[in-house]
Amino acid sequence: MIYTGIDALDGLLEGGIPDGSRALFAIEPEADGQHFLITLLHTAVVSGKKTLVIAPFTSKDAYFVDIAIQSHYHLDCYDELISFLEQSDVEAIIRENPDQDTCRAAWRDRIRSIVKKDGIDLIIVYLDVLSDYFDFAGAVSLFDDLGSDKPVTIAFEYFNLFGEEMLNSILEEIPFDLVINLQSGSGVVSFFNFFTLHTVSWLSLPSRSLPYIVTEGHIVPYIPKIVVTGPSNSGKTTFVKNISESGMSVDRLGLLGTPTTVALDIGHMASKGFDINIYGTPGQERFDPIVPQLARNAMGVILMVDVTRPDQMARALKLKTIVEGNALVPVIVVANKADLEYSVTEEEIRTALEIRPGTPVYFISAINRRQCRAVIDSMVDQITRFEY
């Protein structure tokens, strides 16, 4: 198994990339996607994998320096694990073999020789220069039948200038075990980079665009908004506070002398390798006009109900309808205060709230941090793994 080094992605892939797989990282214009391959390379050599890097656009020293500046990864510390074909090697092969067929044979011989001599586990290929010379299919075919006595994983990076339609046409002819499409400014939330698991041959996963940010050269998968909504005093503020590593709420004393949220709760946490922002909406009816704005671009909705107050189900249904709007997003129902005496059943909740089949319903106590975290873990799975 080859780990990508991105915890959320490795989790989605159920551990990483199986040995012997072919992976394609297709980067669309303006997407900040080159760090995926850099992180993969660094993770591989740290774990002792012998790696061949084919970078026809630069020298080995310049490549190492550039990565150290971008990501603070010092690959020179693992020099004995990294074989390299650099710009001067590429130019020499082309110069000495002006005929394309002999050039192709020279490339294949050189790659096979390094793989066998150095016991290579992983090949990192920057494909653009090779595809300009041999075309895409011809460049990829250089890595057929490597003659190794062990499975060799190959990760290609390719700048896809023509979008998903072009990518689909390529993949109809050339199969890969893993295809990750890296995009900018599309999907559920604008102004973020997105990665889409286009193909995962060993798993059944929906093709879904998930945001990520790049900070100091490192990939951070990101869920910018999960909304927690529900009637007043259903436990939203307690829930958000209990799951958050940092956050704030805007509240004042209600008629019963207890704090009641009049604006929103904001929390931040990490789950399954994702950085997550949590927004709790006010439950009072007079704030309904602002709830759609608070819920705009949410990637998931947690609907909280008080199981000791079945009379509030109609209000909960109204809030669910407002938050969902016309968008189809995953919903989880949290039946809070399950540590107290109550009589409402899961079936009654499902009927009253008109929730879709398969929607999880969790009976919890919002003061129990472990139970609250389990709800967020489930929401991450709903967002990333399941059809909705």
Language-model segments: residues:
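Glycine-rich P-loop/Walker A and Walker A-like loops and their local beta1-loop-alpha1 context
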Residues: D7-L9, G16-T58, G235-T237
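Phosphate-binding/switch loop-helix module in NTP-utilizing enzymes
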Residues: D89-S148, R286, N297
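G-domain G4 guanine-recognition motif of GTPases
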Residues: N160, L182-S184, D306-V307, I332-V344, ...
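Conserved G1/Walker A P-loop phosphate-binding module
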Residues: H218-G257, K272
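Switch I (G2) and immediately adjacent beta-strands of P-loop GTPase domains
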Residues: G254-R286
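Inter-motif core of Ras-like GTPase G domains
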Residues: F287-R309, I322-N326
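Conserved C-terminal guanine-recognition region of P-loop GTPase G domains, centered on the G4
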Residues: V307-P357
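Canonical P-loop GTPase G-domain recognition
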Residues: E341-Y388
